[in-house]
Amino acid sequence: MNHLNCFARRIVSVIALAMMVSAGWPQVIHAQPAGIDPQAEKLLRRMSEYLAGRQQFTLKAESTLEVVLTSGQKLQYDSPATLSVSRPNKLHAHRKGDITNQEFFYDGKTLTLYNPRENLYATTAAPATLDETLDFAREKLDIIAPATELLYKNAADKMLKESTSGFVVGPSVVGGVKTTQLAFRGAEVDWQIWIEDGDKPLPRKFILTSKKVSGEPEFTVLIRNWDVAAKLSDQEFNFKPAKGAKKIDFLNLSAEAAKAK
C-alpha cells in the first residue's frame, strides 16, 4: 500500500477514535448561530481595544500562503516576518520567505517598499496616520504588510464589516499559550482568530479562507514574541538605501524584480 495512503488512513482512524472517546466530553464546538454571537464580538473588540492602546510594540510571525494549482493540488509557501509599530504614524515590517523578500518603512511622511534580494526600492509620500497609510497602501499601491488587519485602531470594525456570522469555538492552546478560538464567516472570506486569555488579549493565530477562489486556499499567520512595552527610536522606521540600491516607481517594482531573476 502506498505510504501516503496508509498514513492518511491512519489519520482518519485516529480522528474517528478521538471522536468516539470524546463523545462523553463537554461539547466545545457548537452549532453555528445565525448572525454574530455577542460573546465572540465582545472578545474580538476587547482584543482590538487592547492593541489600539499599545503605543509601541513589536512581534514576530510565521505566515503561510496556500496556492492552488490548476490540477487542484495545493502548495504552501512560508514567510517569517517581523513587525514594529509606533502609533500614531510609524511602521516597519520585514517579510522574508520562500517567494518574497520585502521590507516596509513608514516614518509618518513617506512609505517605502524595499526588495533586499534585488536591491530595489520605491518611495512615495504617505498620509499622516498609520490607519490612513494602511488604506492608502492597500487601495492605491496594492501592497499589504503582514498582519495589517490587526494594526488598525478600529481593527474589530474592519474585521467585522464583511462578516455575516461568528461564534466562539472554544479554548485552544497556540504555541504553549492558552487562547480562545473564534470563527467568522463572510460572503467571500471565512476567518478564524485565536486570542490570548488573561489580561493581555493578544491575537496569536489568524486564518483567512478565500471561498471565491478555486480550491479555497488559506492564508495563516502564527504570531509570537509579542513585546507590547517596546522602546523604539525613530531610526527603526527610517529607510536608508543600501549601496547600489536602485530607486523605481511602485508600479514597476514587481516587474523589475522579475526581470532581474
What is the predicted function of each stretch?
Residues 1-8:
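N-terminal secretory signal peptides that target proteins for export/translocation
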Residues 43-52, 150-155, 207-210, 234-235:
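Intrinsically disordered, low-complexity boundary segments flanking structured domains
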Residues 32-43, 71, 75, 110, ...:
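Flexible, processing/modification-adjacent segments and terminal tails
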Residues 12-24:
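Bacterial N-terminal signal peptides
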Residues 35-120:
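N-terminal mature ectodomain segment of secretory-pathway/periplasmic proteins
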Residues 35-38, 62, 112, 122, ...:
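Gly/Pro-enriched, hydrophobic low-complexity segments
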Residues 70, 102-106, 115, 123-125, ...:
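A short, polar/proline- and glycine-enriched secondary-structure boundary/capping micro-motif
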Residues 24-31:
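Sec/Tat signal peptide C-region and signal peptidase I cleavage site
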